[in-house]
Each structure stands twice: as structure tokens, then as C-alpha cells.
């Protein structure tokens, strides 16, 4: 039996006092829905992440984001570094609205262009009624404009919209920029690049292997080299963990990118100074006088697989993961137990030793 969906098509906005299209939500502020999760924050700190920039991922225009310090010992007053860290845009509809338009990427681009014209008209006082969306949109134009493109094709499309209105977007890419690297470079944009690389395919099953497409294999093979391609072509970028299912994959995937040619110095910049520049915040991403005391103490070179985070300081607040005062007991020891001579061998790491007794 088939049950017909009797919901009528929605053409107009169902919000009063806001923009005529519900997929434009410039009045949203991420800080309004912010809740600090200590468990998640601790997991991020252990992986070397001390600050998080977040926003509401919903709509063609998504409102403002928030920059949060992951201080487990502080409160909201010290954790919130910026309650308006940027204005966020995309080509995706809002899940909060059933309004029909736009129905395609091209429709989203047309809607965005119309928004810029309407915002300019509104700012010049040509509209008597108050529009809370346009007011918020105009107020946020002095912030960094971050466009969630999600692919190299959409990045180029977004840049064309920005060029039309003399706006240089910072573009959240899709990790496939290497496929159109010249066009990506010509955008003159700073990119935010995800490192959610595809996992290896299981080719032991001949049936599944036969169905595996060459394009998918190429993507799996080449995506870790994307950051190296950006570096070699002098495209500025920051690294994001967006799209990763586990914080533990963050460093693992960075090391994969380094194996594929990304320099350690560029990786460090992509995690520190470049994000700070994107967010126009000179108190983070560096250790200069007057900046926040944000730094890590590690067991070795952070970009080595066996290096661990021993301590993570956020705004001068200390978070200890492994005790620096712990003595190194690794070595080989001989002792006698019940008249038997035994050898005790302790190896492993200093903070996680492993023991083996030889009889």
C-alpha cells in the first residue's frame, strides 16, 4: 500500500521579520548553541588540538562561528576566545526549512548573488521594513568569510561569486584540490583542507575487487598527497579535522601527508599561524609576548609516529597526560626468588613500560 505525502510544496518563507528565503540564516550564532563537552575536549587535547573553531553547519548562509579554547580547568568566560570568529557560507540548503528554492548548486549560487544585491539595497536604506537576516549579514561582512565548498569544483564556483562582489573567501575544500591545482591557485584564496583520507579497499574478495573502479583507487592513492601539491604550488592552507570519525586519525593522517611530501614546517604552519591569520586573531598560533600561553610538551618530534603529548597548556592552564617527573625504569635487572635466578627486562616507553621475566 502506498501512502501519499500530503505535505504541500513550500515556496515562501515561514519566518516573519527575516529574509524571504529560509536557507539564508545569517542571524545564526554558534555561540548561542555552544555546550562544552569535557570528554571530547580531553580527547582532542591528547591529540595536540587546543583550540576549536566551530559553526552551525546549516544553510547557504550559516551565520557566525565561535573560537573555543579547550581548557578543562576553566569556564565559559575563559574558554570563549571569540563569539563571532567568521561568517560562514555554503551551497547547501538548510535542513530546518522545506522551502523549495534552491533546488541545485546553480540555484544556490543565484540565491547568494541575489542576497548580496538585497543586502546592499537594504544597507542603503531603500527598504523600510526591518530584516533581521540582512542586518546580521551586513554586520558580519567585516569578519572572515569562510565558504564551505567541499570539492575543487565548488571551490572554483564559490570564488567566482566572491570575485563578482569583491570578496575574497577563505575556502573549506574537499581534499581533491590537486586535481585542478592551477585553477585552485588562481583563486588566490586561503584554503582549509580536511584530511579524511579514504581507507584502503579490501581487494582479497575477487568479486568486490572486480567492482572497484579505477577512479576510487586513484582517489585513495592520491588524496594524502593533496597537501603536498598545495605546498608545492604555494597555495596557503590550514588543516581541519572535519570529517574524521576519531580524533586519533588526525595525527595519523597528517603523518600520511608528510610521507607523501608535505614538509613538517608547512604542517606546523597549517596547524598554528595560518588558522590564526584566517581568524584574524594575533593572540593564538604563536608564542610571542602578549599571546595566550598555548603550547604542548611532547616526548619527541610531534610529527613522528611514536611521539606523544605529555602536557598541553591552554591559556596558561596545565593539562597533564603523562608525568614528566616519572623516573625511567627501563633496563635489565637480575634478582633471586626462592633460590632461582631470574632476569627482569623492562622495555616499551618511559611512561608505558612493558616487563618480561626470563627464567
What are these regions (language model features)?
Residues 36-178, 282, 302, 308, ...:
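Polyanionic/metal-chelating signatures
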Residues 325-343, 351-356:
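Tryptophan-anchored aromatic micro-motifs
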Residues 292-325:
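C-terminal cap of metal-dependent C-N hydrolases
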Residues 7, 180-183, 200-207, 308:
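Short, charged, surface-exposed secondary-structure boundary motifs
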Residues 15-19, 25-27, 144, 190-298:
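His/Asp/Glu-enriched, well-ordered alpha-helical/loop segment
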Residues 4-55:
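Metal-associated gating/positioning segment near the N- to mid-region
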Residues 162-168, 186-192, 236:
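Glycine-enriched alpha-helix->loop->beta-strand junction motifs that scaffold or abut catalytic
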Residues 1-5, 357-359:
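Conserved small/polar residues in nucleotide/adenosyl-binding loops
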